[in-house]
Every structure is written in structure tokens, then in C-alpha cells.
């Protein structure tokens, strides 16, 4: 198809929760020689701005937000809210095409990858990067002032979603702790996996490893206290730690159903965000009406 011809061939998609090392991986991919997009589109976090915008619109259009993603139902990839994003998504894919091996990173890929897969001419390869949930929670508390319950529920939601989204793909998995402790060894393994998957990057692991230094591990946890995490979250962490570093055909691991309390917490967050959006829209409409009224009053005064 025309779209397949203007989309990157076998791109690398980085999958991981916020604050889990996705930025570090993206920087190293850039150092290895991956094309991350035209200069005007690549953000300081090595994200493609158009991909980022499309992902945000996909989550928003289905009633969610990055901090409480929607529960997507079968058929969402082609529903009206997703169809509205297709034209801009094609622009992003064209920008990523034609420059050798391409890659993109946005934590929201965990949910939106099925949409992007539907637009590509072939399957991407994926790099899954995962991090201890309490380290993620500590980082989110510092950056976003999130409570630990919300943060761990969000960690669970993202990681469960990416394990489903990656089904059938060639996947290399990376523990953030390994990347931080031994970046050269970790990136050598990643690069070798990508080569075996048919994606040959020209750079060396030693050159790319220097980009990990600014992403050092500031929060370190080794345990999962029962009073903080649910059994389901503990099972998810075990599944992530058990991922093969090199998997030609990824199979989603079996996981127990999400604890109702975690699901309820994120539903409440979505409801609060929706209420705030409605209030913002009403305030914008009110300001517009006031501005129109002032113009009409001014015109009436001049006519008099």
C-alpha cells in the first residue's frame, strides 16, 4: 500500500512505563544510529512530537489520560476516536521512513502500539524496559507528587498493557537496574538481539553507553512489601523479571486479574480528569461569550 511504502521498515518501538528507563534506551538507540525523526520533531526526551501527540489524542479520545489510561475495548483501533488520528499518524510515519533503521519512544506506546501496528507495512521490533514498581513510584512522587497507590496501580496498568501489545513481535527485554549498573554489557546484548531480528545499527555499545550516565538510578528498592503491593502486582513483577532477554516471537505471560481496588483507583482518577476537562471547557466557553458580549456592547456604543 501507499502507507506501507511511506512507513519505516521494521522500526524499533520502545515499550515501558514512565520513569522506567525508556528515555535512557531512546538516547542509546540514537547513539547507536537509529533514526528518531527530523530535528523539528524530536523532543529533549528523544520522543517524536507527532507520535507523542497522536498517542495523547488516542488516550484522551477514549476517555483516558497518561496518568490513568482508558480501558480499551475490542475494535478500538478502528473506531471513530482512533480514525480521527490516522492522518497525523501517517505524517509521523512518513517522517520516520527513509533514513535507515527507525525507532520511537513514548510510554503510551504500551496502549497504542496496536494502532501503530495497524498502519505499518510489517511488524516492528520491540524493546521492553522494566523497573521495580517502588522505584517508579518514588520517581513519580518526586516529579508529579503522585501517591504510592496511584503510582503502583499505574505501573501495573502500563506493564500489563505492553505485555499484551507486544504479542507476536520480536522482543528484547531490559531491566533498568541492569542498564544502570552495566550499560555497555546491557546495550551490547540489545544491539546483538536487534541484529538477529534484522535491524542492524551502525553504532557501538560503548559509544551509546555514555548516554546512560545522566539517567543514573536515584531510587533503589529490592523488596515488595505486602502492605503496598497487591498479589497481582507482585505476580506482574515476577513475570517481568522472568522475561527472556531475546525472544523471536513474544508470548504474553499469563497473569491474574487486576485487583478491584487498583481498577477502582484508576477509574476514580479518570473521572476526576474528565470533570476537570469539562470545567475547563465550560470556562473557555464562558470567556468566549464574555468576549463576544464586550464586542457587541462596544459596537452598540459606537453605533449610538
Residue spans for each PLM region:
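Positions that flank functional sites
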Residues: 43-45, 181, 209
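A polyampholytic, Gly/Pro-enriched intrinsically disordered region
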Residues: 61-65, 147-154, 224-230
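PAPS-dependent sulfotransferase catalytic domain
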Residues: 90-202
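PAPS-dependent sulfotransferases, especially Golgi type II membrane carbohydrate sulfotransferases
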Residues: 1-8, 84, 163, 192-304
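Conserved alpha-helical elements of sugar-nucleotide-dependent glycosyltransferases
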Residues: 20-24, 112, 278
